[in-house]
Amino acid sequence: IAQAATQLEARFGKLDTLINNAGVVFEGWGSKASETTLDAWRKTFETNVFALVAVTQALLPLLRKSDAGRIVNLSSILGSLTLQADPNSPIYNFKAAAYDSSKAAVNQYSIHLAHELKDTPIKVNSAHPGWVKTDMGGQDATMSVVDGAKTSVWLATLPADGPTGGFFHMQAALPW
């Protein structure tokens, strides 16, 4: 990570946009929280949260040099505590405890980083790409990769008066 930051600085001098796209599921969809191994929890958080934080910390000095830095943290609707707890929510019965918790942590990190950077031109937001046809999403997913990228592209190109510290999908705010 440090080497990448050094190379980016040497080549460009700054960084305008950071899109943190980290997502793994080790416990399997529909697994029980009480049976998810500590190893699965650790691996999930190592990739989905700690790697994201490490990359952000390494590249933040370059983002501070930008006139309009943007940080987009890829999350998931499965990280919404509001929707996970609502029996009427479409995701209520779709559980993967370590993955869902890691994405809730990403959302919390986005809020804290946005607060820290509120007096700078840097915007920080979480994005739910949707259920995308990828190796992780599978072929039954409802969105193409192009459509799945739309929220990230929108957040990466926000104007100066755009939102920060939010959670979005297709330009609509999602509940925490």
Regions found by a protein language model. Give the residues of each.
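C-terminal helical subdomain
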Residues: A104-N107, H112, D119, S126-A127, ...
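A short local structural element in Rossmann-fold oxidoreductases
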Residues: A2, L83, M136-G138
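Catalytic loop of short-chain dehydrogenase/reductase
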Residues: V24-V25, W29-F45, R64-K118
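Conserved amphipathic alpha-helix within the SDR
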Residues: I1-G13
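Structural signature of the Rossmann-like NAD(P)-dependent dehydrogenase/reductase core
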Residues: N20-N21, R70-S76, K123-H128
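Structured loop/turn residues at beta-strand edges in well-structured enzyme cores
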Residues: A10-G13, D39, T120-I122, A160
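Hydrophobic positions on the long internal alpha-helix
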Residues: I19, V55-L59, L63, Y109-S110, ...
